[in-house]
Amino acid sequence: MSMTPREIVHELNRHIIGQDDAKRAVAIALRNRWRRMQLPEELRVEVTPKNILMIGPTGVGKTEIARRLAKLANAPFIKVEATKFTEVGYVGRDVESIIRDLADAAIKLLREQEIVKVRHRAEDAAEDRILDALLPPARVGFNEDPAQSNDSNTRQLFRKRLREGQLDDKEIEIEINEAVGVDISAPPGMEEMTNQLQSLFANMGKGKTKSRKLKVKEALKLVREEEAGRLVNDEELKVKALEAVEQHGIVFIDEIDKVAKRGNSGGVDVSREGVQRDLLPLIEGCTVNTKLGMVKTDHILFIASGAFHLSKPSDLVPELQGRLPIRVELKALSPQDFERILTEPHASLTEQYRELLKTEGLKIEFKPDGIKRLAEIAWQVNEKTENIGARRLHTLLERLLEEVSFSAGDLAISPDAAPIEIDADYVNSHLGDLAENEDLSRYIL
């Protein structure tokens, strides 16, 4: 990650409106990963990541920041919900499975990167195998150079036709590695054992091939994947993945507020305080056994987030609060924010609906006054009923364009027809009554 904090924030601004404090905190944390790697070895070991706690109502961008961060980081990243885990000893997943999933994510990420590096060699090898199936190699004569014989004019002609896609529909018989897939169902919390059994059965069937009749296009894809897999060194990959997890891994824990003990409620709750206590060693730094070997979590960055509607950050156990030193508060959305969300982000909601209906030959145009009125209604409904943030816009837009979407094929008469204008009057006629009637909006919007 060589992007500066300013560049990271600029990239996040393309998709997320507002919440500058959260973006800055995340950008600095991400950049500090790179800064740490530039330090001398003895100092690098001492620098631990400053974990982040994002606090804010639902639908304001907490999860979206995590999603976009995953794409920017180019590092092992996993997003989990705190509610899915239970205390060790109870039925369900324990928190150590987070690190095992992170290890899987690292292997997948690095394998994809390695396959990109060997792509050209894999394509050449795949082409040769397809050509061998199309044109069995000629028998080498006395005093004849084998390379010359194999690279005959006919073979070169077929190679050219193969690359141009002229042979895509031709059927060939080719030897393909036989995949030994075994579906194993196991109760929650036993995923590790399931994975080990699946790996065992997969290794037992390794190297077995099966003759299949396929079209050239399908065969080329399968053979290319096979050849790329052969060129990737699995042992090297595991070593690199282990380092990537330990030094660059990022874990995003959503819904952390749901495992906070609310107020002074008594009684034992397996899914709450126990989960928090299990998270402590993970965030502080411990060793977890994974398929890559023993993974140290000392330098993994943890970002936790929660709405904290029914509980407060102070309801988390004190030790966990101390391990999330950076606090960022995300603000509730204003009507102006809703207006910007509808138009500014890359692939905004209005653009998505416009392009979806264009596939039917129907043009729609969102007018500025229509967008403004839609934003006002979204804010009003959120204030009167439950505040679900930007997710309210999805509900409103579906309701607003329901009739147009249903009749799109009939309405698209000619390419030159004037677009349907979504202005303030159109919005009021379709949503005005629902927005004004609190009882109706509570159930429908």
Curated annotation (Swiss-Prot):
Source organism superkingdom: Bacteria
Keywords: ATP-binding, Chaperone, Cytoplasm, Nucleotide-binding
Record-level Gene Ontology MF annotations: ATP binding; ATP hydrolysis activity; peptidase activity; proteasome-activating activity
Chaperone recorded as keyword: yes
Pfam families for the chain: AAA, AAA_2
Compartments, as annotated in UniProt: Cytoplasm
InterPro entries noted in UniProt: AAA+_ATPase (IPR003593), ATP-dep_Clp_protease_ClpX (IPR050052), ATPase_AAA_core (IPR003959), Clp_ATPase_C (IPR019489), HslU (IPR004491), P-loop_NTPase (IPR027417)
Any one cellular-component term (Gene Ontology): HslUV protease complex
Binding-site list for ATP: 17, 59-64, 254, 319, 391
GO biological process annotation, one example: proteolysis involved in protein catabolic process
Keyword NAD carried by entry: no
Similarity remark: Belongs to the ClpX chaperone family. HslU subfamily.
HAMAP family: HslU (MF_00249)
Cited function: ATPase subunit of a proteasome-like degradation complex; this subunit has chaperone activity. The binding of ATP and its subsequent hydrolysis by HslU are essential for unfolding of protein substrates subsequently hydrolyzed by HslV. HslU recognizes the N-terminal part of its protein substrates and unfolds these before they are guided to HslV for hydrolysis.
NCBIfam families: hslU, PRK05201.1
Subunit structure: A double ring-shaped homohexamer of HslV is capped on each side by a ring-shaped HslU homohexamer. The assembly of the HslU/HslV complex is dependent on binding of ATP.
Protein's name according to its UniProt entry: ATP-dependent protease ATPase subunit HslU
Protein source organism: Pseudomonas syringae pv. tomato (strain ATCC BAA-871 / DC3000)
Name of the gene this protein is made from: hslU
